[in-house]
């Protein structure tokens, strides 16, 4: 990598293509096979370039590389096709930036799979449940409802699940995904239809998962965890697309919904950690070179690549069972407070999307249909109307895409577009994206002030670790509306619904 290249020298490799699109040209980092691209508006653009400027001044010392460098390093991986893409919520992460997606040609024997392109929280994702309740029904019992959710769902760093499960159950759940939840009575038949991959990755093989991962996962099923994970009671604030909203069962402002954001907990983290160790050895054996050690990878068809994909699929299934379990517990909490059944409250699952995953998909590449391994890290699948992999209910409106905001700010529901299939392998943003590091948030914000501000906004909050609440304060993140509007302007997704929180449950 060029030593201490000045900020102005770096700019020579960056081209602004239109109001929202930048290209990172080959040469920005060594060995780039394809160009990098990123999508921003003026405000998000400033954040990206400030990060690059600081990195140039520090002569490359410090924590993670800037997101632009990470997007470019991914463009240097073997077997990548077309481009490495940074979405508007992109920010520095481990290996891949969070909000970075890339696709690799499955027919190319050199092509790789990289755990850093999926992340440690495999299938961290979001699901949205609708209800037939109105804000006026919920406001008088908002605190009681928040407390009931907090009591029903185990939250926080070391939280243990309440879903009874032995080692055999776990192994079955890892391979069956939502089908396990359905069999055990924790999910409704309709839930499965409204999950990405129908809630089950078929290539999952529990024998590919080490005992340490299973040991970590067993007590954590049906738990929310900490960090940016949450359950929120939200209200429909704005409807941008009447038809798409009606397909989802959302027909008026003020309708109450529930959003659950969680992943594969310690289980997914261990699967990723184990794979990185195995892949470092495989890279030496197969002489695979990368620009960044954090981009440890293995050829897709190598034993290590296949083992990781099987283990990753298990972690994805774990996360779907986890969110299904929390859906069951949320339905119970609502039923208790309103003294009725979840059925009578019409607590149907609108959709469940993954934000951290690698999947084999058919895409048109150079006018040919090609099987690609699409790595989506901090990004969301967003397939258009008529795509064969989305449910019948959404065939005419496009796949729902769930975008969680930050604590106390709005969230969005988008739909996938044809342009997204062409530009970003059917992918859009996943949320707000961090603007400050967790350490900076803790230094600059007071947790009591953050909690008081939420109370002033009329948001009922229950937090297991209040002293960590600054890390998730709105100031710590980019503005989710900027992110969503940029994706809408570029045309890779379309706005359908805006949601605002009235109660937040956090780890």
Swiss-Prot record:
EC number: 6.5.1.8
Catalysed reactions listed for this entry: a 3'-end 3'-phospho-ribonucleotide-RNA + a 5'-end dephospho-ribonucleoside-RNA + GTP = a ribonucleotidyl-ribonucleotide-RNA + GMP + diphosphate; a 3'-end 2',3'-cyclophospho-ribonucleotide-RNA + a 5'-end dephospho-ribonucleoside-RNA + GTP + H2O = a ribonucleotidyl-ribonucleotide-RNA + GMP + diphosphate + H(+)
Gene Ontology terms, MF aspect: GTP binding; metal ion binding; RNA ligase (GTP) activity
Matches recorded under SUPFAM superfamilies: Hypothetical protein PH1602 (SSF103365)
Annotated residues for binding of Mn(2+) 2: 124, 261, 355
Positions annotated to bind GMP: 228-232, 355-356, 404-407, 411, 430-433, 506
Active-site residues per Swiss-Prot or TrEMBL entry: 430 (gmp-histidine intermediate)
UniProt keyword annotations, A-Z: GTP-binding, Ligase, Manganese, Metal-binding, Nucleotide-binding, tRNA processing
GO cellular component, one term: tRNA-splicing ligase complex
Co-factor(s): Mn(2+)
Chain residues that bind Mn(2+) 1: 121, 124, 229
Gene Ontology terms: biological process: tRNA splicing, via endonucleolytic cleavage and ligation
Domain of life per record: Eukaryota
Annotated cofactor note: Binds 2 manganese ions per subunit.
HAMAP family: RtcB_euk (MF_03144)
Subunit structure as annotated in this protein's UniProt entry: Catalytic component of the tRNA-splicing ligase complex.
UniProt miscellaneous comment: Ligation probably proceeds through 3 nucleotidyl transfer steps, with 2',3'-cyclic phosphate termini being hydrolyzed to 3'-P termini in a step that precedes 3'-P activation with GMP. In the first nucleotidyl transfer step, RTCB reacts with GTP to form a covalent RTCB-histidine-GMP intermediate with release of PPi; in the second step, the GMP moiety is transferred to the RNA 3'-P; in the third step, the 5'-OH from the opposite RNA strand attacks the activated 3'-P to form a 3',5'-phosphodiester bond and release GMP.
Function: Catalytic subunit of the tRNA-splicing ligase complex that acts by directly joining spliced tRNA halves to mature-sized tRNAs by incorporating the precursor-derived splice junction phosphate into the mature tRNA as a canonical 3',5'-phosphodiester. May act as an RNA ligase with broad substrate specificity, and may function toward other RNAs.
Family: Belongs to the RtcB family.
UniProt-recorded name of the protein: RNA-splicing ligase RtcB homolog
């Amino acid at each position: 990598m060029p030593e201490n290249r000045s900020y102005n020298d770096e700019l020579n490799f960056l081209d602004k293509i239109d109001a929202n699109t930048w290209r990172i040209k080959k040469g920005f980092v060594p060995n780039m096979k394809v160009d990098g691209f990123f999508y921003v508006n003026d405000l998000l653009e400033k954040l990206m370039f400030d990060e690059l400027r600081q990195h140039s001044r520090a002569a490359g010392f410090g924590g993670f590389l800037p997101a632009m460098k990470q997007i470019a390093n991914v463009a240097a991986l073997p077997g990548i096709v077309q481009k490495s893409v940074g979405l508007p919520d992109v920010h520095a992460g481990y290996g891949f930036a969070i909000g970075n997606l890339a696709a690799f040609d499955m027919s190319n024997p050199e092509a790789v799979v990289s755990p850093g392109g999926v992340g440690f929280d495999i299938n961290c994702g979001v699901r949205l449940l609708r209800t037939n309740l109105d804000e006026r029904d919920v406001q008088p019992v908002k605190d009681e409802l928040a407390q009931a959710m907090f009591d029903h769902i185990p939250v926080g760093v070391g939280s243990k699940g309440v879903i009874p499960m032995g080692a055999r159950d776990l192994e079955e759940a890892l391979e069956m995904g939502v089908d396990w939840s359905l069999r055990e009575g924790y999910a409704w038949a309709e839930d499965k239809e409204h999950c990405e991959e129908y809630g089950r990755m078929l290539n999952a093989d529990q024998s590919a998962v080490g005992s340490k991962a299973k040991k970590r996962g067993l007590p954590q099923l049906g738990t929310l965890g900490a960090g940016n994970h949450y359950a929120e009671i939200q209200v429909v604030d704005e409807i941008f697309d009447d038809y798409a909203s009606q397909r989802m069962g959302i027909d008026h402002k003020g309708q109450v919904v529930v959003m659950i954001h969680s992943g594969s907990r310690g289980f997914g983290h261990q699967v990723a950690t184990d794979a990185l160790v195995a892949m470092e050895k495989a890279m030496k054996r197969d002489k695979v070179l990368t620009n960044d050690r954090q981009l440890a990878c293995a050829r897709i068809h190598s034993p290590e690549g296949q083992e990781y994909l099987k283990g990753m699929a298990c972690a994805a299934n774990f996360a779907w069972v986890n969110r299904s379990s929390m859906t069951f517990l949320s339905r119970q909490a609502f039923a208790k407070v309103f003294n009725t059944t979840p059925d009578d409250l019409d607590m149907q699952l609108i959709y469940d999307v993954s934000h951290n995953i690698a999947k084999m998909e058919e895409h048109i590449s150079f006018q040919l249909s090609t099987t690609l391994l699409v790595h989506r890290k901090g990004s969301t699948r967003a397939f258009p109307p008529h795509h064969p992999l989305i449910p019948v209910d959404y065939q005419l409106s496009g796949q729902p895409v769930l975008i969680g905001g930050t604590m106390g700010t709005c969230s969005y529901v988008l739909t996938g577009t044809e342009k997204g299939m062409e530009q970003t392998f059917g992918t859009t943003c996943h949320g707000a994206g961090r603007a400050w590091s967790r350490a900076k948030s803790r230094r600059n914000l007071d947790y009591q002030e953050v909690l008081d501000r939420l109370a002033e906004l009329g948001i009922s909050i229950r937090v297991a670790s209040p002293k960590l609440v600054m890390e998730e304060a709105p100031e710590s993140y980019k503005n989710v509306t900027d992110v969503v509007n940029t994706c809408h302007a570029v045309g890779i997704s379309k706005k359908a619904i805006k949601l605002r929180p009235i109660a937040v449950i956090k780890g």
